[in-house]
Amino acid sequence: MKNRFRTKKDSHRQLMKEFFLGFIKIHILYHTGERPFYGQELKEELEKHGYSLSYGTLYPVLHKLCDEGYLRREEKNVEGKIRKYYTLTEQGAHLLGQVKEKIKELVDEVMD
């Protein structure tokens, strides 16, 4: 019978995963607002910030952000290869603005 109760270590790990996933989404919104990115570029950019994630994690996040209207996906033929570029939408820019306000508020409170 599988243990129904999580250990503190499991709970901690799950909570950290949820935090990092939120941070990753913010990074994606920010960077795609600067210029169009394709998946591999975003993965490399996130790695510069210390996030190690698989394509199996990245692409579902990108697809969800597109489905919710925060990103736009555009296919381009680059040297005979189809690449999907992601760009921040107006709705995504509005959300990012709200997130930035909340981040500033949180940092001001926590770091005071």
For each of these PLM feature ranges, what is it?
Residues 68-81, 87:
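Beta-hairpin "wing" of winged helix-turn-helix
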Residues 2-17:
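Short, Lys/Arg-enriched N-terminal segment that forms or immediately precedes the first helix
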